[in-house]
């Protein structure tokens, strides 16, 4: 295994799995997106829509009650389970046959939510993507890393990463700190940036797609949904991270001639995913 690898189209083709012509939505996998709080339901809309647009057969959103109408109207393809609380998640409780879970988008850090997240981590064994406020809660309770399932995928931007590992003086030191956590807990980190890097306990991967258009609100929520979808489709976690990051960046490259940088928004990532997939399989 190489210690460093650039993610280009050939690397993606080696990992991409064509969809069987006899498949059905059950085989395409059921993904759960857990998140949302009052005023931040857009994050769940983006993540869950990206999740189903990326190929998951079924997607359910677990959200506080205040978000039910928002998600059902915005993404009619996505099912909804609501928490008993109106404005934040206080108990994560569901009975579903799932293949993957993404948690954290727009979730907030209410004490009730932190307690619910802890109890969820103690019982969850499914492939997991951890983003946004779930990362921030982890950074305040670093010992909870030991509760994560093997190959859990953490998707921090630079500030979220700093809260998790502390400050660094160079890129080399940053990667070394991340690598230590990967080795200790068998994790995968998606270090969002320019370029985005993916780190596990064996290798570091550098993405080659994307541009400055991705520096927009909700871009990370969409990425979390894409990776959660690929996990639901039974991709190995490292391949889900690699393909997800590549597709996410590729949408910005494809859209640039039409919308430029400034006018590109997170919803454009979702709308361009079909073209990105076609670029891979052409």
Curated annotation (Swiss-Prot):
Segments forming domain YjeF C-terminal: 8-280
Entry EC number(s): 4.2.1.136
Chain residues that bind (6S)-NADPHX: 106, 157, 221
Reaction equations catalysed: (6S)-NADHX + ADP = AMP + phosphate + NADH + H(+); (6S)-NADPHX + ADP = AMP + phosphate + NADPH + H(+)
Gene Ontology molecular function, alphabetical: ADP-dependent NAD(P)H-hydrate dehydratase activity; ATP binding; NAD(P)HX epimerase activity
Listed cofactors: Mg(2+)
Entry keyword set: ATP-binding, Lyase, NAD, NADP, Nucleotide-binding
Biological processes annotated in GO: metabolite repair; nicotinamide nucleotide metabolic process
Source species, domain of life: Bacteria
Positions of AMP binding: 220
Function per UniProt: Catalyzes the dehydration of the S-form of NAD(P)HX at the expense of ADP, which is converted to AMP. Together with NAD(P)HX epimerase, which catalyzes the epimerization of the S- and R-forms, the enzyme allows the repair of both epimers of NAD(P)HX, a damaged form of NAD(P)H that is a result of enzymatic or heat-dependent hydration.
Subunit architecture: Homotetramer.
HAMAP family per UniProt: NADHX_dehydratase
Protein name from the UniProt record: ADP-dependent (S)-NAD(P)H-hydrate dehydratase
Native species: Flavobacterium psychrophilum (strain ATCC 49511 / DSM 21280 / CIP 103535 / JIP02/86)
């Amino acid at each position: 295994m190489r210690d460093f690898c650039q993610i280009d189209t050939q690397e993606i083709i080696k990992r991409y799995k064509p969809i069987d012509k006899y498949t059905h939505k059950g085989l395409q996998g059921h993904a759960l997106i857990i998140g949302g709080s009052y005023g931040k339901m857009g994050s769940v809309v983006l993540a869950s829509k990206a999740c189903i647009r990326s190929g998951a057969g079924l997607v359910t959103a677990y959200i506080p009650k205040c978000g039910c109408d928002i998600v059902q109207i915005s993404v009619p393809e996505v099912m909804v389970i609501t928490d008993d609380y109106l404005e934040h998640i206080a108990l994560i409780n569901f009975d579903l046959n799932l293949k993957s879970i993404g948690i954290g988008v727009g979730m907030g850090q209410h004490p009730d939510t932190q307690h619910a997240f802890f109890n969820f981590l103690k019982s969850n064994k499914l492939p997991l993507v951890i983003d946004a406020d779930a990362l921030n809660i982890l950074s305040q309770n670093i010992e909870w890393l030991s509760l994560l399932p093997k190959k859990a995928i953490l998707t921090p931007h630079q500030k979220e990463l700093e809260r998790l590992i502390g400050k660094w003086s160079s890129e080399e030191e940053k990667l070394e700190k991340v690598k230590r956590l990967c080795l200790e807990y068998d994790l995968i980190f998606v270090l969002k940036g320019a370029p985005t890097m993916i780190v596990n306990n064996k290798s570091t991967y550098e993405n080659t797609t994307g541009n400055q258009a991705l520096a927009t609100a909700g871009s990370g929520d969409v990425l979390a949904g894409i990776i959660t979808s690929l996990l639901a489709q039974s991709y190995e976690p490292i391949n889900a991270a690699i393909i997800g990051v590549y597709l996410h960046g590729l949408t910005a490259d494809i859209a640039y001639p039409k919308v430029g940088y400034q006018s590109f928004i997170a919803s454009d990532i979702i709308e361009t995913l079909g073209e990105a997939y076609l670029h891979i399989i052409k």
